[in-house]
Amino acid sequence: MAGRRGDSEQQLLTPVRIIKILYQSNPYPKPEGTRQARRNRRRRWRARQRQIREISQRVLSSCLGRSTEPVPLQLPPLERLSLNCDEDSGQGTEGELGSPQIPVEPDTVLGSGDKE
């Protein structure tokens, strides 16, 4: 069983080292030459940075076995959402400051959405 933990750490460090080498291979351009030459060098540098970023995402997804994209969050339908404040959710304090909330129908606050 010895060495198991090191294997997983090595498996995680390998893609990190590859990505580090990729970024180090593309240093920021030197600020010399005419304005147009500097602009062109920066433009080419940004294009290379985009390519490195894409390659890095591919390396991570292939080495770690999962996508780098975040998992989409499932939200309830808008029809089920409300602005009702009279429901006690159990959060907050006992002695809240200010006047009590007056329950209002959402249609009166938001309107029907029709232009007058």
Curated annotation (Swiss-Prot):
The RNA-binding motif binds to the RRE, a 240 bp stem-and-loop structure present in incompletely spliced viral pre-mRNAs. This region also contains the NLS which mediates nuclear localization via KPNB1 binding and, when the N-terminal sequence is present, nucleolar targeting. These overlapping functions prevent Rev bound to RRE from undesirable return to the nucleus. When Rev binds the RRE, the NLS becomes masked while the NES remains accessible. The leucine-rich NES mediates binding to human XPO1. Residues 36-49 have a biased composition (Basic residues). HIV-1 lineages are divided in three main groups, M (for Major), O (for Outlier), and N (for New, or Non-M, Non-O). The vast majority of strains found worldwide belong to the group M. Group O seems to be endemic to and largely confined to Cameroon and neighboring countries in West Central Africa, where these viruses represent a small minority of HIV-1 strains. The group N is represented by a limited number of isolates from Cameroonian persons. The group M is further subdivided in 9 clades or subtypes (A to D, F to H, J and K). Keywords: AIDS, Host cytoplasm, Host nucleus, Host-virus interaction, Methylation, mRNA transport, Phosphoprotein, RNA-binding, Transport. Asymmetrically arginine dimethylated at one site by host PRMT6. Methylation impairs the RNA-binding activity and export of viral RNA from the nucleus to the cytoplasm. Belongs to the HIV-1 REV protein family. The modification Phosphoserine is found at S8, S99. The keyword Hydrolase does not apply. GO terms for molecular function: DNA-binding transcription factor activity; RNA binding. Homomultimer; when bound to the RRE. Multimeric assembly is essential for activity and may involve XPO1. Binds to human KPNB1, XPO1, TNPO1, RANBP5 and IPO7. Interacts with the viral Integrase. Interacts with human KHDRBS1. Interacts with human NAP1; this interaction decreases Rev multimerization and stimulates its activity. Interacts with human DEAD-box helicases DDX3 and DDX24; these interactions may serve for viral RNA export to the cytoplasm and packaging, respectively. The gene is rev. The keyword Transport applies. Residues 25-49, 82-116 are annotated as: Disordered. Its main location: host cell. One of its GO terms (cellular component) is host cell nucleolus. Escorts unspliced or incompletely spliced viral pre-mRNAs (late transcripts) out of the nucleus of infected cells. These pre-mRNAs carry a recognition sequence called Rev responsive element (RRE) located in the env gene, that is not present in fully spliced viral mRNAs (early transcripts). This function is essential since most viral proteins are translated from unspliced or partially spliced pre-mRNAs which cannot exit the nucleus by the pathway used by fully processed cellular mRNAs. Rev itself is translated from a fully spliced mRNA that readily exits the nucleus. Gene3D superfamilies: 6.10.140.630. A motif (Nuclear export signal and binding to XPO1) lies at residues 73-84. Residues 18-26 are annotated as: Homomultimerization. A motif (Nuclear localization signal and RNA-binding (RRE)) lies at residues 34-50. This is Protein Rev. It is found in: Host nucleus, Host nucleolus; Host cytoplasm.
